[in-house]
Amino acid sequence: MNKQPEDWLDDVPENIDEEDDEIIWVSKSEIKRDAEALKDLGVELVELGKNALERIPLDEDLRAAIDLAQKIKKEGRRRQLQLIGKMLRARDVEPIQTALDKLKNRHNQQVSLFHKLEALRDRLVEEGDDAIPPILALYPEADRQQLRSLVRNAQKEKAANKPPKAYRQIFQYLRDLAETAE
């Protein structure tokens, strides 16, 4: 057997613990997971529409690759998505991820606002004039007379089993009020 000379200990640096702290070992599996996450981010970007894609900070090469991937079908699309993932690995994806999260959050906020407005509309139709003051407190620019007439029409339509035209008009009016309040 080959024995190492006793002086091999002299080659070991004294601050070995400090060097270990500086070296960050990343497993191959973690690298693959990160690459897959970036590829999934690329898929999300490709599935976005043109208007949403314009709001995301992308350089020209990446934008061109995404535009091309949106046009390609089948196997070529898979390869293009892999290329987009590779391009994302070479870039700082934090601003892209932040912009994408804002787009998703905006959609969720809009859905919750619509649910809130639907509940207000249902309350207006059920309670009638008694439900108008809280809405006026919430939206001071609301027209009390218009709200009352829409509510009366919706109640008449409901009693006569007619299509809910005024019901939809109440929702549109509340949505317009919410948009102007923002």
Swiss-Prot record:
GO terms for biological process: assembly of large subunit precursor of preribosome. Keywords: Cytoplasm, Ribosome biogenesis, RNA-binding, rRNA-binding. Its main location: cytoplasm. CDD domains: YjgA-like. It comes from the Bacteria. It is found in: Cytoplasm. One of its GO terms (molecular function) is rRNA binding. GO terms for cellular component: cytosol. Member of a network of 50S ribosomal subunit biogenesis factors which assembles along the 30S-50S interface, preventing incorrect 23S rRNA structures from forming. Promotes peptidyl transferase center (PTC) maturation. Belongs to the DarP family. This is Dual-action ribosomal maturation protein DarP. It comes from Serratia proteamaculans (strain 568).
